[in-house]
Amino acid sequence: MVWLSGRSEQEGRDAAASCVRGDLAVQVAVAPALVGPLQRVAESFNGSGAVSADYCAKIEVMGIDSPVALNALTGTWDPKLGPVPSLWIPESTVWTARLAAAKPAEVSGQPTSVASSPVVLAVRGSARPGFDGVRWLDLPTRQEQLRIALPTGADADGTYLAAQSVAAAVGRTAGAALSEDAAKSPVVVGSLSRWGKDAPKSTTAGAALEALTRPGDVLRAVPVTEQQLAAFARGRGDAVPVAVYPEGPTAAATYPAAVLDREETTDAHDRAAADFVTYLTERGNAKPLAEAGFRVVGQPAPAKTASVEFGTVEPLAPASNGAVISLVDTMNRR
């Protein structure tokens, strides 16, 4: 063990010696839920002596709500948010699809998923029996009984992912990727519009989750990711919502890492950002994400909790960017 440690230290010194251009600060903007675990990964990367374009890259992680980041990236970056990022990791393709549509030249290559978390229904404990055997296909027609809130905004990827799952079910895709034409079809638009129109009012997913812990029956459920519900329930005792997994192919937040090619950053920043993504997706390096309740390739599923089973989920093939945008627009129009 002493020899291995010594070798690692020597490798680090050798790598540092090749950083002929010095250190390079590389900003990474991420969804707030990713901040803690990705800071741990960044510390490991920064200490590894990694060299990018003759620099020693130093990753700096900052949390920004995805709608705020999207507005800044598609418009003028606000310095109050921090330095311009070279890498953006939001919750889902809901955000990267819009960036790619607005400024395609600023997204370098295809974003890479660094983790995933399927959408579930967070259900009030007393209402749980009414959700037995429920399917994504059923949700629009049973909304009066199920009373599912469908918030939009910064923490509401669950709503948009649930919409993808429902759209695939009513569009009869059999788990295949939903196309833009299918997302705009009358049957899909009509089903989602009806589902949203009858939804209980709720400003945010966080507010809906809080409401589910209090007495009442106006609101019985809200779609969120597994990780979101597990994080909310942590340390709250028994009076928390429980996850229900509707039957059928299920969409997931995929935490896409998009390398950004902007005027304010250099090729060296882009290279370092891409190198960090590669490091993050190598076996074992994303363990902090798994420990935080995300599903990570090569890591065991998170441990079952009183609220979330983290069981087997039938995956839904990712929808096209055009379909994602169309479904978001449908849910936001109600």
Which positions does each model-derived feature cover?
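Short helix-loop capping/hinge motifs at secondary-structure junctions, enriched
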Residues: 126-133, 168-176, 263-273
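Extracellular/periplasmic juxtamembrane helices and adjacent flexible linkers that interface
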Residues: 1-9, 262-334
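Extracytoplasmic/secreted proteins, especially bacterial periplasmic and envelope-associated proteins
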Residues: 33-40, 44, 68, 72, ...
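Sec-exported extracytoplasmic/periplasmic mature domains
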Residues: 43-51, 78, 93, 100-101, ...
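Periplasmic-binding protein-like
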Residues: 109, 113-121, 189-190, 236-265, ...
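Ligand-binding pocket segment of bilobal, Venus flytrap-like solute-binding proteins
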Residues: 173-245
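Short beta-strand->loop
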Residues: 29-31, 143-186, 192-198
